[in-house]
């Protein structure tokens, strides 16, 4: 009963991860955040494989899913540090999340709750011609805190998924070992008793 509830919980966690990361992927696309887009895409694939492994009782898939969650937590911790400008990181000057190919920022920077965007003219000389120079004011919640909230939610789901993935793998392995112990995985097939036929040889006489 406990194994069934743990497996169902892991399926629910995988479903929640897919919903949350798809929502995050949409806004990362809108903000041209290429590094998060790539990480989200890999995460979606791994979560689907983990979900498949949970449904089909495939411990290898679940183990791979658990290993990826460790990397996923590490990535989200980095994103939190980036937006909170921990150490030498700067969300204003570093273009790590766009692979240094554009000056785009998080979509929430201009579209956060209560934000008012004002175009600045004339633009500074250093501003690229194909970019707007704007100021954002009046936000009820700054965009970096929205991004931190997204990453924090992903970390919570990943930790829960890791715990239940380890539990489900343990239960599946123990179940396979017990089944093997009683002879469930014998390589030879069962052969029923064979009937032996007794033939009586009698001499035959041919008339001339």
Curated annotation (Swiss-Prot):
InterPro entries: Na/K-Atpase_Interacting. Expressed in fetal brain. Weakly expressed in adult brain and thymus. Not expressed in any other normal tissue examined. The record marks 91-92 as: Breakpoint for interstitial deletion to form SUSP1-NKAIN2. It is found in: Cell membrane. It comes from the Eukaryota. Keywords: Cell membrane, Chromosomal rearrangement, Membrane, Transmembrane, Transmembrane helix. One of its GO terms (biological process) is regulation of sodium ion transport. Pfam families: NKAIN (PF05640). The chain crosses the membrane at residues 1-23, 35-55, 62-82, 153-173. It is a multi-pass membrane protein. Its main location: membrane. One of its GO terms (cellular component) is plasma membrane. It is linked to A chromosomal aberration involving NKAIN2 is a cause of lymphoma. Deletion del(6)(q13q21) within NKAIN2 and involving SUSP1 generates the SUSP1-NKAIN2 product. Belongs to the NKAIN family. Interacts with ATP1B1. This is Sodium/potassium-transporting ATPase subunit beta-1-interacting protein 2. It comes from Homo sapiens.
